[in-house]
Amino acid sequence: MKAEMKYTILLLASFAFFAAEASSQCRAFTKRNCLPILEDYTQNDNYNAAVLIPGDAAELDMAFYGGVNYRVVVCSHPVLGAVEFGLYDSQGNSIWRNTDGSDHVDLSLENTQQLSIRISVPQSDAALIHEGCVSIMLGSKD
């Protein structure tokens, strides 16, 4: 019984370590590869990133204030392939999609509203499933 408990604790500690390591690597990836895409836009204070695998989808709701110029950046590790993303209003209507493969969009809204950023990682037929960081950054300027 003690041996089982010991292995369970060791297993849980290993999971916690690997989760913290993945988060740390994702932060470093974001700082190195994604932050420069904001250029002269001021980054908001939120860090939004996740480790995803082929076939995954994610969604993030964010408030956009009227009259402010924004840059939305979705930056992903190349191992994930051509990650798609789009902006949607509260009724689910598409406002913009990166059909051209762009990693960012610049926009300004007349009225304050909540928008959803939806991301989808393409499926892969590879025998080995790779995971990679996907970061969403929001910058603004007046």
Q: What is each of the regions a protein language model found here?
A:
Residues 22-41:
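Predominantly extracellular/luminal regions of secreted and cell-surface proteins
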Residues 7-18:
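Sec-dependent N-terminal signal peptides
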Residues 18-20, 28, 127:
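Processing junctions and N-termini across compartments
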Residues 24-25, 50-129, 140-142:
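Acidic, Ser/Thr/Pro-rich low-complexity intrinsically disordered segments
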Residues 132-137:
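Eukaryotic complex-assembly/interaction regions
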Residues 1-5:
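N-terminal secretory signal peptides that target proteins for export/translocation
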Residues 43-44, 54:
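A short, polar/charged loop/turn motif at coil->beta-strand junctions and beta-hairpin connectors
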